Structure formats: structure tokens, C-alpha cells
């Protein structure tokens, strides 16, 4: 069984002092405009497995094998694929955003503490129990549930 980690909202997070994203076979990351860093849309998949890497590389490029013995487009297609290639400009935006990640995580942590302080004043709102780990996106998932008062 191949395990794919959904790390779309956890960029920069840690668990047991280890960065998330390399515990499983593959990891999915999102760079949508609502995430910790953004390129406007899209994301990436990371893996240390050569077979998975080759498959993902082909899949994102219309299924091209990118065989160096043949010109691009004349190589074989063993799988169907789509156009999920990232342009250079989107990649450049991502690199600039990545430089801001530590500051984004720090600001999110400050925001979480402010929200937590305010929300604790309302007994009908239950806060999620957050473990003592670095969570980059936690302020957006603060409330566990509301008690309805009828």
C-alpha cells in the first residue's frame, strides 16, 4: 500500500521535532492562495522513491517519458497525463514565498494566541486541543464546536 501524506495545510509544521512531509511514500503540498505560502494555485508532490518520482514527472507532463534519446513529443507515452507543469514565473513566486515561511508561521502563532484569548471568554465555544508542536496553519482550525443554546 502506497501512503500519500496530505500536508497541504501543514507546510513548516513539525511533530516530535521532525518536519512533516517525509514520513510516508509521497507527500502532497498546496500553494493555493489560502495556504501558508502561495503561488496563486497549484502545489507539489515530494518523494524519495525514484519509481514514484518518475511516474509523477510523466503524469504532470502529458504522460511524456522525456527519454533523452528522442525529441520531446516523439517519445513514448506509457501513461495518460495532464499539463500540470509549473511555469518559471510561478516557481520564482514560490521561492520568494518560501523565504517568508518562518515569518508567516510566527504571525500565525501570534494570531492563534489572540484568537484563543478572545474565544476562551465564551463558554459555548470549545477550542481544539492543540499539541505542543509547531503547527503553521492552526489559527484557521481553532474552534472545535459551538454549543447551541436554544
Model-predicted regions and their roles:
Residues 4-5, 87:
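Active-site flanking residues adjacent to catalytic metal/cofactor-binding acidic residues
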Residues 5-38, 68-69, 73-78:
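Conserved active-site segment immediately N-terminal to the catalytic lysine
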Amino acid at each position: 500500500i502506497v501512503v500519500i501524506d496530505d500536508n497541504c495545510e501543514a507546510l513548516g509544521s513539525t511533530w516530535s521535532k521532525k518536519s512533516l512531509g517525509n514520513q510516508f511514500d509521497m507527500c502532497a503540498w498546496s500553494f493555493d492562495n489560502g495556504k501558508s505560502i502561495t503561488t496563486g494555485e497549484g502545489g507539489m508532490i515530494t518523494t524519495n522513491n525514484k519509481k514514484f518520482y518518475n511516474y509523477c514527472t510523466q503524469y504532470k507532463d502529458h504522460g511524456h517519458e522525456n527519454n533523452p534519446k528522442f525529441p520531446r513529443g516523439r517519445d513514448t507515452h506509457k501513461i495518460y497525463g495532464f499539463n500540470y507543469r509549473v511555469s518559471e514565473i510561478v516557481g520564482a513566486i514560490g521561492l520568494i514565498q518560501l523565504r517568508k515561511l518562518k515569518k508567516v508561521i510566527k504571525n500565525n502563532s501570534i494570531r492563534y494566541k489572540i484568537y484563543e484569548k478572545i474565544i476562551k471568554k465564551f463558554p459555548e465555544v470549545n477550542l481544539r486541543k492543540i499539541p505542543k508542536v509547531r503547527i503553521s496553519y492552526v489559527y484557521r482550525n481553532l474552534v472545535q464546536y459551538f454549543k447551541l443554546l436554544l
